[in-house]
Amino acid sequence: MTSTINPETLSGERIEELQQIAGDHMFMHAAQTNDWRGKLKVYTKGEGVWVETADGHRYLDAMAGLWYKSAGYGRTEIADAVYAQMTAIDSSPSGGATVPQVELAGKVAELYPDKGARSFFVSGGSEAVETAVKMAKKYSILNGKAGAFKVISRRYSYHGGTAMAVSLGGNAAADPMGPLMPGAIHVTNWNSYRLPYAGDPIDVAIKCANEFEEVIKHQGADTV
């Protein structure tokens, strides 16, 4: 059973026990096990932008988790709303929808310039990226471009941890895995500080746009 009530601090012995269990039985996202084995930070509390570890240290979480915690930690009003909905009905059977789902779709449409906007709700960023790519491919098929399977993205970008999302990232760390998604094409990442032709941001943007256009021409516009 997972504990849902975190104490302010844990004993040193308990922290070491948790670190040992984690080292033996967990993989951490975007981290090498040997880098944190035996010294893993065990968090017990979060409030706003602050998090606290089991040994009493307090840290500013400037990354918002892994860019997903923009609402902050310890938001009781969010927890209360989630609890209320989960005790009523937490999801809908296939082919149906809950009241909050429908209301949220309507709210998104109100905020979006295109009032005919539709929402497809998913569980996280990686799934959102993969769904967007599949929708784009389906749109191409329905509009007579059945051969448009290639997706152009920027090198050294991050789109998620699933196979398709990793393919789009264009990071060298994924190269040993071999080809993941056919048709994943990469262009220069717009970063005026690190590019070999670094300089004025406007000039860099124009060069990147020109490269993007050339890649489309080279690959064939009907395939992108």
Placement of each model-derived feature along the sequence:
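Glycine-rich, flexible loop/turn motifs
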Residues: Q32, K39, W67, G74, ...
